[in-house]
Design a protein with these regions (language model features):
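Glycine/Thr-rich beta-alpha phosphate-binding loop at enzyme active sites
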Residues: 62-72, 111-168
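Hydrophobic faces of well-ordered beta-strands that scaffold small-molecule active sites
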Residues: 12, 25-29, 58-61, 90-94, ...
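A gly/proline- and charged-residue-enriched helix-loop-helix capping module
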Residues: 1-21
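Loop-centered beta-sheet repeat module
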Residues: 41-93
Length: 169
């Protein structure tokens, strides 16, 4: 099941403290489902601040909020990060369905907010590239697609990013 189901910040911090230093810890932060606008930005920033000294890196799902809110959140995260001596990398996790126009916005954000890396890509709801029979797809049920089902889409995004931001991201 996809989504951001979790027991809450305090429980997550406790679990991390109990297992710290036994692995590389990437933390995917997101807004609360009911948050919009400024509250969504505050959600991102609150988690980032609370977990900054704990994480080895952070990820944010690009499509979790509208582009304008994402840019405002990235502005807030970049401003906070500049106040810290420790650099914790920040990565954007991109969906497989981004248009070229959206990718241009992503590359601008990578430059503007000093994004350290990209995870290309997360799942898609598009089943166009699946080769299973309709009967098989109905048995599988609804939900997002990953793996071979998004290979071509992911490759297109990686190729675009390589051409626009290079190999250092």
């Amino acid at each position: 099941r996809t989504g951001f189901n979790n027991p809450g910040l305090d429980m997550i911090k406790l679990r991390i403290a109990q297992r710290r230093n036994s692995y590389v810890l990437g933390i995917n932060i997101n807004k609360n489902p009911s948050s919009e606008g400024k509250q969504a930005i505050d959600d991102f920033l609150s988690l980032y601040r609370e977990l900054y000294d704990t994480a080895d890196y952070f990820t944010i799902n690009w499509n979790s909020v509208e582009t304008e809110v994402m840019e405002q959140a990235l502005t807030a995260l970049a401003a906070f990060r500049e106040t810290r001596t420790k650099h914790v990398p920040l990565l954007l996790k991109l969906p497989a369905d981004l248009t070229e126009e959206a990718l241009n916005v992503v590359t601008a954000c990578i430059d503007n907010y000093k994004i350290d890396g990209v995870i290309a890509t997360g799942p898609t709801m598009d089943r166009t590239y699946l080769t299973a029979s309709l009967n098989r797809l109905q048995k599988i049920g609804t939900g997002s697609i990953s793996g071979k089902g998004i290979g071509d889409k992911s490759f297109r995004i990686v190729k675009f990013l390589r051409g626009h931001v290079g190999k250092n991201v």
